[in-house]
Structures are given as structure tokens and as C-alpha cells.
From Swiss-Prot:
Secretion signal span: 1-13
Gene behind the chain: CP3
Taxonomic source organism: Entamoeba histolytica (strain ATCC 30459 / HM-1:IMSS / ABRM)
Domain of life the protein comes from: Eukaryota
Pfam family, one: Inhibitor_I29
Cysteines paired by S-S bonds: C112-C153, C146-C186
GO MF terms held by the record: cysteine-type endopeptidase activity
Residue positions of the active site: C115, H251, N271
Annotated protein name in UniProt: Cysteine proteinase 3
Gene Ontology BP annotations: immune response; positive regulation of apoptotic signaling pathway; proteolysis involved in protein catabolic process
Ranges that cross the membrane: none
Location(s), subcellular: Cytoplasm; Cytoplasmic vesicle, Phagosome
Protein family: Belongs to the peptidase C1 family.
A single GO cellular-component term on record: extracellular space
PANTHER family assigned: CYSTEINE PROTEASE FAMILY C1-RELATED
């Protein structure tokens, strides 16, 4: 009898926790069947969080890991062991850098594999503000619809999209070409800014990445974001997972700085999963930790920008 009472009490407590979580994250379920399914997924993720430090029941706690991977990444390729691509110039860099103050709030790619567009607009927005003192919000949807060198919601790469912006004579504003999270027909809008050149560095040097960020501003970087621990990342912690791969890139994010605290050295990185995930859309990643998640393997940034 006691065991039955305990079971019922735990079940009730779990459902209360789920309802509180759903209210916090404005979750609405289509019907009772979906509610029960998401509740079951939530309980599975709750067990994972209870067994793994530095994780939490965040906005993605009602998604299976398979669903998460299918809908929230957007770069899939392997960095070879050797590469002929250019290396970063390694110079003495400041102890810490933080470009968050020149950036827009983190955006949300939704259930579309368009991370490559968000890291591209982020580095363009950051560089324009850094060099020209103007903060714009550029159109990710224009890249999804118009950049034929990439694959819209099926993935892409910032090296391609930065070249597209240069060859297309710029990119328009988000307000003129708003984000839909689905691929559509390319539309013509007024372009506002362009890149005059871009660079891709794949040498794997974290010290080199520090120099790039310090000198050039925010950098679009590839990483392995496929671990369950990253899906359920706990804000304020320095992310580290020994099973995170250093050469298999599947997500593009924006490195905006680096620093250290009592828990270790870290990179400051802006994601494209909205402001409800992480720390207002940002996360800290272990730095000088054998290229954690491949952070230094694929860096992309504009070498110059101009207004049109």
C-alpha cells in the first residue's frame, strides 16, 4: 500500500513539474495524445538531467534527441585530418574579449536546418557595427531562399553564404525579408550592406581563433552540437563533453568572445535557438580543451564590410 501511495505521489509530482515547465516555456499541445507523448519524453529527459551535471530541463526538454538533431542543426560534414586551407595568424591576444554588446539578441532558427544563415548574418551584423557603428538585423530568409550554393533548411556553410553576399552585392534587412523557417521563392529586396571579402580558417588552432575574434570581431564557427548534454545545456555552466567530436561539424554558431572564471577557460558563443535556451541564447564552451566540439576547426568571417 505504501509503495502504491509513493508511486502515485511521484507521478503527480512529475506531472506538476511538467505543467510548470510547459507554462514557463509557453508550450501548447494539440491534443491529449500529444500531451501524454511529450510528458513521457519530458520524463526521459528528466532522468538524463538527474544523472548528468550541467544539464537542465530547458526549452527542449519535451523533444527526443532524434527530433532535436533532425530539426535544430544544419551543418553536416567532416573536417579532414589534413587541410591546405589558410591558417590563422597567431598573435598575442588580450586575456579576454566580449563582443556581445555590439550584437542583436540571439535569434531563433526554429525547426529548419538554417543555422548557417544565422551565423552568417551574425558576423555581418557584428562586423558592420564594429567597423561602421550601425546595428542592423539582416535577413536570414534571403539566404535560405536565394543562396543557391547552399540548401536552405537542409543545411549550408557560412563560407558559401559570405561569398554569396559579396557576389550578390549585399544582403537586405530582416524587416524587409522576414524569416519563415521554410524555404521559399527568392524575392528581390534592397540590399543594405555587403562583405568586401571573407576568410575561412581550418587549422584547429584555438590560439589563432582568439586572435581572429580579438582583431575582427564575431566569427562563424562549426561545431558538433549533437550530444544530448548540449540539447539540455544548463545556462551559466561551461559546456564540456568528452564524447563531443572535434572533426564532425553539424551546427554553425557565432563565437563572440572568450574569457575565464573560477571554473576554467571558456569561449562565449551565440546560438540560434532563441533567447529561452542557454543564457539569453548564449553559452560558454570549454576553451583550450583539445578543441572541444571542434570549435577551432572551421572559422569563417568577413575581412571587410561596407554599406550600400
Amino acid at each position: 500500500m505504501f509503495a502504491l501511495i509513493l508511486f502515485v505521489s511521484l507521478a503527480c509530482a512529475n506531472e506538476v513539474a511538467f505543467k510548470q515547465w510547459a507554462a514557463t516555456h509557453n508550450k501548447v499541445f494539440a491534443n491529449r495524445a500529444e500531451y501524454l507523448y511529450r510528458f513521457a519524453v519530458f520524463l526521459d529527459n528528466k532522468k538524463f538531467v538527474e544523472a548528468n551535471a550541467n544539464t537542465e530541463l530547458n526549452v527542449f526538454a519535451d523533444m527526443t534527441h532524434e527530433e532535436f538533431i533532425q530539426t535544430h542543426l544544419g551543418m553536416t560534414y567532416e573536417v579532414p585530418e589534413t587541410t591546405s586551407n589558410v591558417k590563422a595568424a597567431v598573435k598575442a591576444a588580450p586575456e579576454s574579449v566580449d563582443w556581445r554588446s555590439i550584437m542583436n539578441p540571439a535569434k531563433d532558427q526554429g525547426q529548419c536546418g538554417s543555422c548557417w544563415t544565422f551565423c552568417t548574418t551574425a558576423v555581418l551584423e557584428g562586423r558592420v557595427n564594429k567597423d561602421l557603428g550601425k546595428l542592423y538585423s539582416f535577413s536570414e530568409q534571403q539566404l535560405v531562399d536565394c543562396d543557391a550554393s547552399d540548401n536552405g533548411c537542409e543545411g549550408g556553410h557560412p563560407s558559401n553564404s559570405l561569398k554569396f553576399i559579396q557576389e550578390n552585392n549585399g544582403l537586405g534587412l530582416e524587416s524587409d525579408y522576414p524569416y519563415k523557417a521554410v524555404a521559399g521563392t527568392c524575392k528581390k529586396v534592397k540590399n543594405v550592406a555587403t562583405v568586401t571579402g571573407s576568410r575561412r580558417v581550418t587549422d584547429g588552432s584555438e590560439t589563432g581563433l582568439q586572435t581572429i575574434i580579438a582583431e575582427n570581431g564575431p566569427v562563424a564557427v562549426g561545431m558538433d552540437a549533437s550530444r544530448p548534454s548540449f540539447q539540455l545545456y544548463k545556462k551559466g555552466t561551461i559546456y564540456s563533453d568528452t564524447k563531443c567530436r572535434s572533426r564532425m561539424m553539424n551546427h554553425c554558431v557565432t563565437a563572440v568572445g572568450y574569457g575565464s572564471n573560477s571554473n576554467g577557460k571558456y569561449w562565449i558563443i551565440r546560438n540560434s535557438w532563441g533567447t529561452s535556451w542557454g543564457d539569453a541564447g548564449y553559452f560558454l564552451l570549454a576553451r583550450d580543451s583539445n578543441n572541444m566540439c571542434g570549435i577551432g576547426r572551421d572559422s569563417n568571417y568577413p575581412t571587410g564590410v561596407k554599406l550600400i
